[in-house]
Swiss-Prot record:
Organism: Galeopterus variegatus (Malayan flying lemur)
Protein name in UniProt: NADH-ubiquinone oxidoreductase chain 4L
Subunit comment: Core subunit of respiratory chain NADH dehydrogenase (Complex I) which is composed of 45 different subunits.
GO MF terms held by the record: NADH dehydrogenase (ubiquinone) activity
Family listed: Belongs to the complex I subunit 4L family.
Transmembrane residue ranges: 1-21, 29-49, 61-81
Function statement: Core subunit of the mitochondrial membrane respiratory chain NADH dehydrogenase (Complex I) which catalyzes electron transfer from NADH through the respiratory chain, using ubiquinone as an electron acceptor. Part of the enzyme membrane arm which is embedded in the lipid bilayer and involved in proton translocation.
Reaction catalysis annotation: a ubiquinone + NADH + 5 H(+)(in) = a ubiquinol + NAD(+) + 4 H(+)(out)
Length: 98
């Protein structure tokens, strides 16, 4: 396995561990999700360039579109939560109140 794949998998794992461990603020959770999406995008781009399949070139673009949608929804939720509650702590959110 080339070292670039190991680095990308380690970046994904570090973002996943950050998402699971540092869940106190909503903004830090969003940043960890963006790190995961960035590492998946780089991995999909490198794999599609190495495989030379014509249909696989659209996979990174579709992944980038979903990452942009996830970012927009996450920032909209962050603005709404900070406007309603005054802070972005995840512990203060309760899904039963919505």
């Amino acid at each position: 396995m080339p070292p670039i794949y190991i680095n990308i998998i380690l970046a994904y794992t570090a973002s996943l561990v950050g998402l699971l461990m540092y869940r106190s603020h909503f903004m830090s959770s969003l940043l960890c999700l963006e790190g995961m999406m960035l590492s998946l995008f780089i991995l999909a781009t490198i794999l599609s360039l190495n495989l030379h399949f014509t249909l696989s070139f659209t996979l990174p673009i579709i992944l980038l579109i979903f990452a942009g949608c996830e970012t927009a929804v996450g920032l909209a939720l962050l603005v709404m939560i900070s406007d309603i509650y005054g802070l972005d702590h995840v512990q203060n959110l309760n899904l039963l109140q919505c």
